[in-house]
Amino acid sequence: MRRPALALAAIVLASPLAAQQAGAPFTVQETGQGYATLDEAVGSIRMGRGTILIQPGTYHECTVQAGGDITFKAVQPGSVTFDGSPCEDKAIFVLRGRSSTVDGIIFRGVRVPDGNGAGIRTEMGNLTVTNSMFLDSQEGILGGEPTGQQIVIDKSTFSGLGTCDEAPDCAHSIYLANKGSVTITRSRFEKGTGGHYVKLRVPNVRIVDNSFDDTGGAKTNYMIDLPEGGTGVIANNSFVQGRNKENWTGFIVVAAENRTYRSTGLRIEANDARLAPGEARSPAFVASYSRDALAIGDNRLGAGVRKFETR
């Protein structure tokens, strides 16, 4: 008779712990351990590998990943918002691990004194971002490292980002630099507030199946800026350039600052580029400073959009 009593007592004692774990906003999936703050959950993984499940809610906190391979995942995509509160005057997620994955999270309202407040600041390790949103901040995703870093962004939204008024050298919706590659697919860019929508200082790019809607933009510049050149593919994107531009002269601009990377064979094809109603200026769809032979294929260009110009 004592064994059932002991078993019942164990259940009763375990119940508060189980309830605590179930109610924790941040849980490491592999261990089932819950944490009150994201930083505690990140610290528990250390140099290992783990997935942090995040319960629905709005959080005013940030984290620095110092190592390991960590996935930050919303239990319900789109139900988790990190609002303001950057770490190190940089970003809500400052990433210095071996790799990082961000899945289903909203980043909003990030501002820092130097004008480069971002949802994500990647400083080390590969990065994958999927099904996430970056809203109303100085920058969306910023950073990179001088290695063969691989960055992949998929099914994400960038809105209300960028500034040249608050940042000395401008902030952008996405601004990345590495010696590896950046892939951006099935994502939406809209309502920019300055700078470029995508600025990449990388040797290899893949920008495919995205939507760039600049009709609600203000003081924006290029849709895609590859300031040091680069190869790869820009295809199947739709572009609409708005009227409120700081620099309206090109949609895609190659090697405007340096010819660090060869641009020979950069494929730009099957895109659709148009001007917003009432826009009378005539930008180039592609403008190149590189002197390399780009592979510009068939693109659908609306009235007033010129195919190509050499600068």
Locate predicted features.
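N-terminal signal peptide c-region/cleavage motif recognized by signal peptidases
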Residues: 14-16
